[in-house]
């Protein structure tokens, strides 16, 4: 099991990034959340099986459309959180 926090920087707001991230999480059996940050980045907390988290990160790095552009992804490893049960978009 892998639990991470990811700060995604680039053109990632106003391009459907959060909903794309939620879809990628669902497809890869990931629980956690995603939200826009005031600095223009997107913050993601994600937890799942190691291979699923890797696949999820690959999808997130590609982005939802040609209008989205991921310039940097800072990944921080966290301790497992047993209270995460679904993936949601936070506001």
From Swiss-Prot:
Pfam families: Acylphosphatase
Species in which this protein is naturally found: Oceanobacillus iheyensis (strain DSM 14371 / CIP 107618 / JCM 11309 / KCTC 3954 / HTE831)
GO MF annotations in UniProt: acylphosphatase activity
Coiled-coil stretches: none
PANTHER family for this protein: ACYLPHOSPHATASE
Cross-referenced Gene3D superfamilies: 3.30.70.100
Name of the top EC class for this enzyme: hydrolase
Active site per database record: 18, 36
Reaction(s) catalysed (UniProt annotation): an acyl phosphate + H2O = a carboxylate + phosphate + H(+)
Protein name: Acylphosphatase
Superkingdom of the organism of origin: Bacteria
Enzyme Commission number(s): 3.6.1.7
